[in-house]
Regions:
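Hydrophobic, membrane-embedded alpha-helices of multi-pass small-molecule transporters
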Residues: 1-2, 38-46, 70-78, 82-85, ...
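Membrane-water interface regions at transmembrane-helix termini and the short interhelical loops
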Residues: 1-6, 55-62, 77-100, 116, ...
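Transmembrane-helix bundle segments that line or gate the permeation/cavity pathway
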Residues: 1-59, 84, 113-116, 120-123
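Flexible loop linkers connecting adjacent transmembrane helices
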Residues: 2-25, 92, 212-238, 265-277, ...
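Helix-loop-helix connectors at the membrane interface of multi-pass transporters/channels
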Residues: 7-25, 49-73, 105-108, 172-181, ...
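Loop-to-transmembrane helix boundary motifs in multi-pass membrane proteins
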Residues: 19-28, 66-83, 87, 156-165, ...
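Membrane-interface loop-to-helix entry segments
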Residues: 30-34, 38, 44, 54, ...
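Hydrophobic alpha-helical segments and their helix-loop junctions in multi-pass secondary transporters
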Residues: 43-61, 73, 106-143, 205-210, ...
Length: 359
């Protein structure tokens, strides 16, 4: 988009395929689908986040009940924080909150790693990474056609849909803050580093829990997590030092995780709705931040987690098709850029040869 003077929106990904027609009905339709996918993707995240925040608050202060009313109030509070960040802008609000978020996340992960079974975690990290890479193709295409299980719908398809719903806003937001970077830098900073961090995160927390169950006999952790998945992390912290402090930090971290997602998502939705304009009125950015909270609250009251999951999958399906087309557009754009670089190099060589001949 920046290189060719195009708007920073999803429609620009189709420019190598359909050219100026991205400014017509096709481009409008693509951006609308991206807006809906992002809106419901963030709303789903908020719905899941408040369930865990509510569980954490109940764990720290039992007088606070686990109830829809508390979760709706939590949605309002978190949305207010996101609204403040959006109004503050990219440099003052979003950037500072993102730095705080990463500091808390890394600190929490290092704490669990150091006080937990460190050697076991490192061994499991290497083994699980190898197992993941070995099984990724088979697991990706496994739809359990010959068995009957709710797992595939509640987890695999939901996570795929959730990821796809997040794709437009994450991609566009990272593109917005990565202007001037090379493709190599972009791939390294956006794909490689976060992937390694994700592997480490799941290994540290997941394998610490497995070590407690397998090696230290805390089998009750299994039934406690099965009874309420939202308190899984807090039940894990019961077996670690500084339980109350770590649990409080975790609640704060969950809040900042969502707020950073909501504020950046609001900026991207606002940009999409404005045709790729980077600077928009404050009230317009605030509108999208508030709407995300309203959608999350309505879906949570109407149908709980199942309603959130259903809307995520429904909105992600059409965008999955757009993503495939966008990948073809990216491939064609790189091919064109490659030919352009070769032509430029050839022109420079010819010019240099001509200058030497004249000399």
């Amino acid at each position: 988009a920046f290189r060719h003077g195009l708007p920073l929106s999803m429609r620009s990904a189709l420019y190598p395929l359909i050219g100026e027609r991205i400014h017509g009905p096709i481009g409008h339709a693509v951006d609308v689908v991206a807006i809906l996918g992002t809106l419901f993707g963030i709303a789903t995240t908020l719905g899941l986040s408040v369930a865990q925040i509510n569980a954490g608050l109940n764990y720290l202060w039992p007088s606070i009940p686990v109830a829809s009313s508390v979760q709706v109030i939590t949605i309002a509070a978190v949305t207010a924080l996101a609204l403040f960040s959006v109004v503050a802008g990219l440099d003052k609000g979003v950037k500072n909150l993102s730095i705080l978020n990463m500091v808390l996340a890394v600190t929490l992960m290092l704490f669990v790693f150091l006080v937990g079974p460190s050697i076991f975690i490192l061994e499991a990290f290497l083994q699980n990474t190898g197992s993941y890479l070995n099984n990724i193709v088979e697991r990706t295409f496994n739809l359990q056609a010959y068995t009957h299980s709710d797992w595939i719908g509640n987890w695999t398809l939901f996570i795929f849909g959730w990821t796809i719903a997040w794709a437009p806003f994450v991609g566009l937001f990272i593109a917005k803050i990565s202007r001037g970077r090379t493709i190599r830098q972009f791939v390294f900073g956006v794909m490689l580093v976060p992937t390694i961090f994700t592997f480490l995160w799941f290994s540290v927390f997941g394998d610490t829990a497995l070590h407690l169950i397998m090696n230290e006999g805390y089998t009750t952790l299994i039934s406690e997590v099965q009874a309420d998945k939202a308190i899984a992390l807090f039940k894990l912290f019961e077996h670690l030092p500084l339980t109350s402090i770590v649990s409080f930090v975790t609640v704060v971290l969950i809040v900042t995780f969502f707020v950073t997602s909501s504020d950046s998502g609001s900026l991207v939705i606002d940009s999409l709705a404005s045709g790729g304009v980077l600077q928009t009125p404050v009230w317009q950015r605030a509108f999208w931040a508030i709407l995300e909270g309203v959608v999350a609250a309505v879906l949570l009251i109407a149908g709980g987690l199942s309603a959130l999951q259903t809307m995520t999958i429904v909105t992600a399906l059409p965008f999955a098709i757009i993503m495939i087309i966008a990948m073809l557009g990216m491939w064609r754009a790189l091919v064109i850029e490659g030919h352009r670089d070769i032509s430029l190099l050839h022109h420079m060589q010819v010019s240099r040869y001509s200058d030497n001949s004249l000399a």
